[in-house]
Amino acid sequence: RKTTNFLHLGSFFATLTILFFLCYSYVKTSHAPSSALGWLLLDHSDITETEENPFFLILSSLCGLMFSVYFGAYFFHRHPGTLNEASGVLIAFKTFSFLAILFYSFNHNTLFFFIMNGLVVILSIFTYFIFSLIFSQMRCPLFFRLVPVTCFIYSLFSFFVLALIPLANPSTIQVAGNLLDMLFIVSLGVFMWQRKKKQNKKHFEA
């Protein structure tokens, strides 16, 4: 019963994460960066608070954090030891992402904010890497292995592009990165249901 609640709540917050981000993308009118990578590498000192409108981005990040907690709780109780380390990294990644967005809303011109976003970028790359590694070891279907690998490669690619090629379109690069992060959350949500279906099938056959 408890694990079923974790599964449903995780799916609920995954859906809200995507919906709130789509709302943010729709109402966003300024050139403010929309990810930790953009906040870390791009100059945004001239952006005022009225131009930022981060409300939906904050909600999306908060729901992403809640999803990571329920994802970790589900596998901790339902499949102990399967994804404990990866879930811990995911929760840390989403926690610092949420904190970075909160700091961006109040004061984004501090050294602490710069360090925070550097940590988020590192955690994002490591999160995609560890999930791609674990899903490969678990011999998961191609979709689940391909999504984190794609996110990992694109994270490294976009980091070096934004850092070394200032003429590149930063908005397009960040939007693509955000969409891949949404796809990653979708894949984890589907993975939860796939594991539950597989477990129920084994229980039925037994």
Report each predicted region and the residues it spans.
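Non-transmembrane, juxtamembrane loop and terminal tail segments
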Residues: 201, 205-206
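Hydrophobic, aromatic-enriched alpha-helical segments typical of multi-pass transmembrane helices
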Residues: 1-200
